[in-house]
């Protein structure tokens, strides 16, 4: 969804990924799997009815005839509403092209890094994400002693970063709909929060935001 990846060239035995982040499937969206053709006859370790050969799935035979490929590892019926949302997102991604999405993603994260450096040089931020494009994914991980407080306060102002222990603020602009002006607005809001004073946060609350 945000990094170009050619599994046919990489030739892994298998690959598993989520669809709720940069594929925009949302919380609870289905997982996905690639299985190399050399393993298409692999017996499923845990068999489910949805892993049966789709042409004979409703014959209700007592002997399971697995589907060909990764489909044989499916267990039950996937969540249809999640699939509907994911289908709409995948159509947009296909129309835009992953290469173009990747380029915009790199530009968005580079802009965020530049804005933080230019506008908040003495605020104590240290970017933990590599600067080189080929080593960077789709988000910036920024170290700051008040990262958790900043995450919570930004959420209350309409921005949705997240926090990871001990001091990481993660910012992930989605290239399909995030604008470069959104990066500007975020950094301005961070500056306002720091200027006003960061509120204390109860450490007994959840440590993930």
Q: What residue ranges belong to the model's regions?
A:
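Active-site core of PLP-dependent enzymes with the aminotransferase class I/II
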Residues: 1-6, 34, 179-182
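Conserved PLP phosphate-binding loop immediately N-terminal to the Schiff-base lysine helix
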Residues: 1-24
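PLP-dependent enzyme catalytic core of the Aspartate aminotransferase-like
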Residues: 148, 153-209
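Conserved small-domain helix->loop->beta segment predominantly found in fold-type I
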Residues: 69-76, 93-143
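Short, charged, surface-exposed secondary-structure boundary motifs
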Residues: 3, 24-30, 173
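PLP-dependent class I/II
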Residues: 19, 52-65, 69-74, 129-134, ...
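Active-site C-terminal subdomain of aminotransferase-like
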Residues: 24-28, 34-104, 110, 209
């Amino acid at each position: 969804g945000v990094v170009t990846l050619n599994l046919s060239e990489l030739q892994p035995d298998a690959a598993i990924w989520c669809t709720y982040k940069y594929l925009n499937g949302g919380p609870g969206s289905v997982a996905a799997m690639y299985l190399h053709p050399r393993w298409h006859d692999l017996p499923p370790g845990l068999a489910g009815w949805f892993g049966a050969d789709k042409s004979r799935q409703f014959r209700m035979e007592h002997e399971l005839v697995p589907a060909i490929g990764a489909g044989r590892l499916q267990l039950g019926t996937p969540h249809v509403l999640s699939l509907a949302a994911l289908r709409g997102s995948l159509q947009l991604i296909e129309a835009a092209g992953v290469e173009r999405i990747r380029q915009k993603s790199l530009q968005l994260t580079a802009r965020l890094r530049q804005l933080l450096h230019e506008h908040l040089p003495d605020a104590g931020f240290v970017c933990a994400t590599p600067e080189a494009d080929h080593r960077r994914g789709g988000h910036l991980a920024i170290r700051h002693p008040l990262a958790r407080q900043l995450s919570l306060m930004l959420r209350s102002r309409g921005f949705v970063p997240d926090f990871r222990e001990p001091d990481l603020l993660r910012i992930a602009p989605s290239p399909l709909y995030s604008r470069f002006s959104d990066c500007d607005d975020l950094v301005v809001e961070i500056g306002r929060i720091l200027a006003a004073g960061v509120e204390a946060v109860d450490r007994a609350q959840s440590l993930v935001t």
